[in-house]
Amino acid sequence: MTNFKLKIASRRSKLAMVQTLWVKDQLERNIPNLEVSIEAMATQGDKILDVALAKIGDKGLFTKELEAQMLVGHADIAVHSLKDLPTNLPNGLKLGCITKREDPADALVVNKKNDCYKLETLPEGSIVGTSSLRRLAQLRNKYPHLIFKDIRGNVITRIEKLDAGEFDCIILAAAGLKRLGFESRIHQIIPSEISLHAVGQGALGIECKSDDKKVLEIINILEDKPTSQRCLAERAFLRELEGGCQVPIGVNSNIQNEKLCLTGMVASLDGERLIKDQHIGNINDPEEIGKELAKKLKQQGAEEILSEIFEKFREK
């Protein structure tokens, strides 16, 4: 393969660029004579900062603009935080590669006056910042004595708001903090028993044209099979529930002895109703595991909970 040029579409946020530059570096290191360039842009989710993500109600908030660049031939691939990539992609595009996963857990970040507390010991009335309905519902279920407020902006902006005293603590993805060099600000990794993470959290998804065999061959070098198996199960679970990135659906997955165990959760917005179950299956059929787990939760009332949430979104 000689003198092949590859263009990446990326969000222009600092975290997105760190992730995209990592992909660029890995590809150029492993494939001789490959020239990789980056087209950075703002997405709808980057531009609308004064409205809670759930109220915007669009499943492609952080991806549509990047996908448009590929569909018109201006980019060959798009690098996404996999948790932001909808489970149903536009015609002509596919998820071509899933990279090795960073820690998928949520993390507690506190300001100096609260560094003696863990999430479970925060005083009544403490103000917790999060933009995620998934985190909000689970934490309301566990800690109804805390006050939860929406927080928008990139990771750095959110930490600045925390340190300025607007919040006592904030919840962020551990992976993003580590990739941006803020690992020292992680006060607590939140156990999955308290908060299941988002579908695909911690992994990068590389999207490309479905029929571009050369590009698929190039990006396959970054594929991590165990991560891919786990994330495909998680995404099948979300797809079967017809949920999106902004609804209270959480997961956890692990692989042991050629078996994949997937735990899933659906909760009401107030956290009062929370359904959780798990399904174990053949590691080589991850999507079936996700579908079966979704069926289990539907039988326990997940569809009713999600229907109520979607109805509230429509009213707004």
Swiss-Prot record:
CDD domains: PBP2_HuPBGD_like
GO BP term (any one): protoporphyrinogen IX biosynthetic process
Pfam families per UniProt: Porphobil_deam, Porphobil_deamC
Residue numbers carrying S-(dipyrrolylmethanemethyl)cysteine: C245
Keyword Cell inner membrane assigned: no
EC number in record: 2.5.1.61
NCBIfam families for this protein: hemC
Protein name: Porphobilinogen deaminase
